[in-house]
Amino acid sequence: MSLTLRVLAPDKSVFDDTVEEVILPSTTGLLGILPGHISMVTAIDIGVLKLRSSNGNWDSIALMGGFAEVESDDVTVLVNAAELGKSIDKATAEKEFEQAKAALNKLEDQAGNSADKLKAKESLNKARARSQAVGE
């Protein structure tokens, strides 16, 4: 048995194929999906989706938040943005992660606008997801 996984962003279909297993970064923690999983809808956090293909290899997709629906061995993930781990340049992702971390540290040392700090934390989370997806 297998699952049909679709990862859709507003501007493109990121992934559409059959897989053996999916691990989703839900807002309440990692969520493993295998064939026969109960139907559900869950919120997706910024993080890394892991999928095991029929050949047993694991691949990663960086997700930038959204929702996932599981129904009858179909997993549909609707996200704000997504990127296949194998298409991310490792050096660029690591550089962006370090820059985001430095920007957040600079803001946390200052008293001031919490909206800027929230944006910096979100940027750090996105950069971390991209960096982790490429390293998987």
Curated annotation (Swiss-Prot):
Membrane topology label: Peripheral membrane protein
Stated name of the protein: ATP synthase epsilon chain
Keyword Glycoprotein: no
Matching SUPFAM superfamilies: Epsilon subunit of F1F0-ATP synthase N-terminal domain
An MF annotation (GO) of this entry: proton-transporting ATP synthase activity, rotational mechanism
Annotated Basic and acidic residues bias: 116-125
Keyword DNA damage: no
HAMAP family: ATP_synth_epsil_bac (MF_00530)
Record-linked InterPro entries: ATP_synth_F1_dsu/esu, ATP_synth_F1_dsu/esu_N, ATP_synth_F1_esu_C, ATPsynth_dsu/esu_N
Protein role: Produces ATP from ADP in the presence of a proton gradient across the membrane.
Ranges where the record places region Disordered: 112-136
Compartment(s) where it occurs, according to its Swiss-Prot or TrEMBL record: Cellular thylakoid membrane
Entry similarity comment: Belongs to the ATPase epsilon chain family.
GO annotations of cellular component type: plasma membrane-derived thylakoid membrane; proton-transporting ATP synthase complex
UniProtKB keywords: ATP synthesis, CF(1), Hydrogen ion transport, Ion transport, Membrane, Thylakoid, Transport
Top-level taxon of the source organism: Bacteria
Pfam families: ATP-synt_DE, ATP-synt_DE_N
Subunit-level organization: F-type ATPases have 2 components, CF(1) - the catalytic core - and CF(0) - the membrane proton channel. CF(1) has five subunits: alpha(3), beta(3), gamma(1), delta(1), epsilon(1). CF(0) has three main subunits: a, b and c.
